[in-house]
Amino acid sequence: MSIEEIPQGADVSILSKNEKKARELIKKLNLKQIKGITRVTFKQRGNLIYAIDQPDVFRSSAGTYVVFGEAKVDDMNKRIAEAQQQQAQQDALSKAAGETGEAGEEDKSQDAITADLEKASLNTNKIEEEEADDGEVDESGLDAKDIDIIVEQTQVSRAKAVKALRVHDGDMVNAIMELS
């Protein structure tokens, strides 16, 4: 069959001479062809992806795979940038729609959720610090060097360090473990 005889729009793949030889050798190795695979991707450093659409995949008895097809390079950084741009456009459209009278919908974007979580964690941290730093703490019976070491290691207030030392009867290791 020549190229002129192939009907227009037919799904025909033309194999190179080297690929034909490789396929013949694969048949001699008794590899099993795996049907139903539509895409194979290979990931490399820097979010670089090699993608093969509609591949011919063969599996050996040892569990290795041989993949035939046209490899295309996908740059994940570019895809991520495009996705972020689309997300920004959708956010702008939803804000514009919200201003026209569709109020009541909550913002469920990733940035909004992250901001809400950070705000909540900052509020709880402030409350805890206010409770702990109510005034001077009685350090009698404890070594000042131990308190300084705990404050330095765990980055907590002096009052919390004293409280942890008192709970653990002056044991620095357990106090540090509790605070970190």
UniProtKB/Swiss-Prot annotation:
Biological process (GO) annotations? Answer: cotranslational protein targeting to membrane; protein transport
Matching Gene3D superfamilies, A to Z? Answer: DNA helicase RuvA subunit, C-terminal domain, Nascent polypeptide-associated complex domain
UBA domain segment(s): 142-179
Q: Where is the signal peptide?
A: none
Q: Give this protein's Gene Ontology molecular function annotations.
A: phosphatidic acid binding; phosphatidylinositol-3,5-bisphosphate binding; phosphatidylinositol-3-phosphate binding; phosphatidylinositol-4-phosphate binding; unfolded protein binding
Q: Where in the cell is it found?
A: Cytoplasm; Nucleus
According to UniProt, the name of this protein is Nascent polypeptide-associated complex subunit alpha
Q: Which organism is it from?
A: Debaryomyces hansenii (strain ATCC 36239 / CBS 767 / BCRC 21394 / JCM 1990 / NBRC 0083 / IGC 2968) (Yeast)
This protein's gene is called EGD2
